[in-house]
Amino acid sequence: MRDPIENISQLQKQLNDLQLENQILKNILDQAGLSYYKELSAFKQNENKEAYDPEQGKRIIHPSIITENMANQFFGMFWGRQDVYAKRSVNKESGKAAYYPQCDNFWTNACHKKIKDGVNCKDCKNRSYKTITKKDILNHLQGNSYNASDVIGVYPLLSNGTCRFMVFDFDNHDKGAEESDFANADDTWMEEVEAMREICVLNGIDPLVERSRSGKGAHIWIFLDKPIDASLVRRFGFALLDKGAEQINLKSFKYYDRMLPAQDSLSDNSSLGNLIALPLQGKALQDGNSAFIDCNWNAYSNQWEILFRKPRLSQEFLEEKIKEWSNPIDDIVADADESDREKPWNRMQHFNKNDVEGKLHIT
């Protein structure tokens, strides 16, 4: 019978041999320009493949009570502007849903929407935006409004040109889509969301995927460990999309609508930038929507736990990846507006290629 020490030594030798063999094979694949990350990722996913549960709402364990502290921690993850926010509103006649910045003078005689003279909120001299409060966030999370008019949206681009998170939006924002809560018309969008999730994983990013309130769209959230210049964050986002176009074989990426923040900076003091509706909307969550989902499209049972487990990216990580992924067209497109910038899957047809910093005050 072998000595235990001898057994351990033999096992260690076998492990070393396997690691060496593994590295040699990886080098051969790298030299041949063959990627093994996609196959490895798919294998790992298949290992944990779980059937889709049709009862998505029942999977979720809802807290018996949502406290002000929970609301504060929630906003700490989705930290947008605090001096202005938006709420969902449904037109009683048309049934269309839209999000409006909240104003102290809304629908008073000083409100141009009531007067209907065509003046936008940002050009209104009487605008007096409301600041977001813990009560607003609690109402959003509790979801007691029958028509979801308690759902809030935030503006990710802060007034100083920084942001604390980024989002890839796979909702339908075509004209008329507001009638169905911005739902996509078919299920092909799911393939693109999975591709974007895989792109993140392949490049060392652990994203949080949310199924939208319609159940027919998604948001992919990436959190940052401190306020970072939106211009840098957007350069990182564009570089990630370009890198993904090299790694993932997709015929198109037509359901990807936009990346937020959608601007590098605000054009003036009256500008707000694009808004994004926050997840964990109490009413939609009952049906398993506005919920965080795994790679099998099943809602996580403990939504709060998965949210707070997600890592935050540092500025150093973003800068390193931008440098690593840089290519000749970066200088051309770095400052492009989202609507003007050609999507990478289209462009590929033409080219070869710890702790949060800051103080949060919500009253």
Describe every region a protein language model picked out:
Residues 2, 57-216, 223-239:
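Signature for HUH/AEP ssDNA processing cores
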Residues 38, 42-65, 330-362:
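Acidic, low-complexity intrinsically disordered tails
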Residues 151-190, 194, 225-352, 356:
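DNA replication initiation modules
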